[in-house]
Amino acid sequence: METALTKTPEKRQVIFLAILLLLWEASSEAISYSMPEETESGYLVANLAQDLGLRVGELTTRGARIHHNGNKELLQLDAERGNLLLKEKPDREALCGATEPCVLHFQIILENPVQFFQTDLQFTDINDHFPEFPDTEMLLKIQEIAQPGTVFPLKAAQDPDIGSNAVQNYTVSPNLHFHVVTLSRSDDRKYPELVLDRALDREEQPELTLILTALDGGAPPKSGTTTVRIEVVDINDNAPQFLQSLYAVEVPENSPLNALVVTVSARDLDAGIHGNVAYSLFQGGGGPQPFVIDEITGEIRLKGALDFEATSYYTMEIVATDSGGLSGKCTVAIQVLDVNDNAPKLTISSLTSSIPENAPEAVVAVFSVSDPDSGDNGRMVCSIQNGLPFLLKPTFKNFYTLVTERPLDRESNAEYNITITVSDLGTPRLTTQHTITVQVSDINDNAPAFTQTSYTLFVHENNSPALHIGTISATDSDSGSNGLIIYSLLPPHDQQLGLASLISINSDNGQLFALRALDYEALQAFEFHVGATDRGSPALSSEALVRVVVLDDNDNAPFVLYPLQNASAPCTELLPRAAEPGYLITKVVAVDRDSGQNAWLSFQLLKATEPGLFSVWAHNGEVRTTRLLSERDAPKHRLLLLVKDNGEPLRSASVMLQVLVVDGFSQPYLPLPEVALNPTQEEDMLTLYLVIALASVSSLFLLSVLLFVGVKLCKKAREASLADCSIPEGHFPSHLVDVSGAGTLSQSYHYEVCLTEDSGTSDFKFMNPIIPSSLLQDS
């Protein structure tokens, strides 16, 4: 991703063009200060808080700091008092050389919000340097025939000071032949020329010695001197002349040492030794020059490395002197060409290494870029990788702010490595990269999420207490305490469930435990909700449904409903002697409280006095005859029936049945009972049974009447008041209800018990069947 004035397919780039800088500078006024150089450290430059219109404490709270743009750090900020202090003594000449004015540019950076203030500090020059000549002695060879008014150039003195503190005047010691004049170059530097006032006579005075003095304009002025020794030579009437008065050349700054810069050429019309010309580097502007000249050929070559960023332009004077002392001069102007030899520099001013997720636009870093090259070599493009939720914003004058483009999500990416790439536009391009690591700090923005919306757990009944029946699990993509989950049981919708006595949960890992043994016959299944809550602030939670299904174990034996079993005597059924094969004697009705295959019942005839006469249907418990009865068959038979389920382990119940063979229902043949009972005791038992039966029938009848009346009253009340009326519904186990309405016996008999005072054997009297005999035979 890139922020740019122009976009490429690869990157969005931000290009600071000159026009953008000009527009910014036009709209931003810098705060300027001025002070003389060589001021002692600790000097109070200004009260910065007052000048910026800020409260004193605001500089500290907003993290105020100074950005020096790569310059020497001469200033320090007392943020508590708001004072801008001098850190060390400044030397204008070391800072700016001959550049005027000497201005130190720096920025004041504030955070929360980010603000920039351009500030300039100008150092004024003081006269702290003496003029100094490059040589302690200068030698001039002047022919004795030189005419008055002839001018002889002299080497200028150097003074690092500028303006009026630089060299302003030259004087020469009193003499009869010469005076000195002070002239100015195009850069306003002063240089001396020696003017002949009176003709020389070698024979009279072959050599003269003068003292040349250079004076600056300080108060008081400072001076420097050198000795000018003049040798008077014989006549030489032609001075050397250069072919060009000005040589202008361009040299790339990366030229190697000893590279040829330019060749100057001068000629002398004299013959012989007076026509021989020697070249010398006579005058350079402002200090040592990285050039050397061959005195014979006039070739000017590099003797030191060039640096466009340090000095981009050189001017020097070349003197051609013949053996007679006559000379000529020319000017060589050398323009150093910039090459792209400096990679951009990136300076981090402010860096935030941790950003909270879901935060709006946040400042990650503030940095500046610089490139001392010129032109396209110094123009820069700043970019970051594509696909990152960050933007580069140009804030001011080569400053960028790295901000978040949108709220971050720590769960998607907890760390970003942002590579800032700064490239110049030179050929070839030079690039600097800097990587910033940003950590995304977590906030509690994710609720725990269960791995399933609902859980179904299976547990066998009769389990041991504290049995682990299953585990629910939730995850939270937050970190730290925001991602720690606490599990809990939520209050059930059915308050009668008693969940707290059935189930417990481990709050740390979500394991569920059955607190007590479960009974399938009492509770086949139940549901409840579990909650998962994190430890964030505020805490977030979610819930899931848990359904516990109790699996049936074969823990109940079949229970025989009919015939009723008596511990003292088995149930007695009657069999007509004329019964056809397949005659239904009775039907064994049994139930099993278990479910599934544990409740699948089968019937079996275990033992009979006449095994070939009777059979039991395995699936419905019907006891039938298998053949016709004969006279040889006994009048009484005992049958032992077995009712068993299909569970594991198999459980069963036995039924003892006594069958009496009778010739007819009106005159049954009843043998004496095997055990003689006390008649009084038998009468008491029969009476008790009759009372119980009568009470049961009466209760059922009364209950039915009450229920019928209640239903009618509820219907009338609902119709009258248009209000809801709920009728309680009884719960009857499905395996105890005869859905077909046919019952378990296919024949209905009416029994009448006849008790007489002289009935010693308490015989039963059987009435005719309620159902016609023809129907019985059809069945």
Swiss-Prot record:
Glycans are attached at residues 169, 223, 225, 227, 417, 566. SUPFAM superfamilies: Cadherin-like. One of its GO terms (biological process) is homophilic cell adhesion via plasma membrane adhesion molecules. Residues 1-28 form the signal peptide. This is Protocadherin beta-8. Residues 29-690 are extracellular. It comes from Mus musculus. It comes from the Eukaryota. GO terms for molecular function: calcium ion binding; identical protein binding. GO terms for cellular component: plasma membrane. Forms homodimers in trans (molecules expressed by two different cells). Forms promiscuous heterodimers in cis (at the plasma membrane of the same cell) with other protocadherins. The chain crosses the membrane at residues 691-711. It is found in: Cell membrane. Cadherin 1 to cadherin 4 domains mediate homophilic trans-interaction, the interaction with an identical protocadherin expressed by a neighboring cell. This is a head-to-tail interaction, the cadherin 1 domain interacting with the cadherin 4 domain and the cadherin 2 domain interacting the cadherin 3 domain of the other protocadherin. The cadherin 6 domain mediates promiscuous interactions with protocadherins on the same cell membrane. Each cadherin domain binds three calcium ions. The keyword RNA-binding does not apply. Disulfide bonds join 96-102.
